[in-house]
Amino acid sequence: MLPSNVIKELQELTQTNRKGVDALFEAESELAQKEHDLDLVEAQAFLSAEGTVADRQALGRLEAADARLQRDLAKAKVNRVRTKLKVIESEIMAQATMSKMMQAEMKL
């Protein structure tokens, strides 16, 4: 691999990493909104239900099932973005190591 290729790869990975930070913010914002929506649906269902506290809680959870699914999907998205960022950071470190090895070889 040529030094210019290593530099180009590092630049591309760094740019992708920056985009990933923005994607993580968007995913975390979406997750916060979904958690808020879930809390509202559960609370409204609990307050409108009749019966014992246990019955009302169970009905609240049932009525909030779709909102909970959306929240769980948003969590999965956040985790996916975080994982991708870790992979990119590992690739950056590997490329940086290759760059240093190439520098050492050139000095020989």
Residue map of PLM features:
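Short, charge-rich amphipathic alpha-helices with coiled-coil/heptad character
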Residues: 1-20
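The feature represents the first ordered module of a protein
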Residues: 16, 24-27
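Extended alpha-helical coiled-coil "stalk/arm" regions
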Residues: 27-56
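Short, glycine/alanine-rich amphipathic alpha-helical segment
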Residues: 50-77
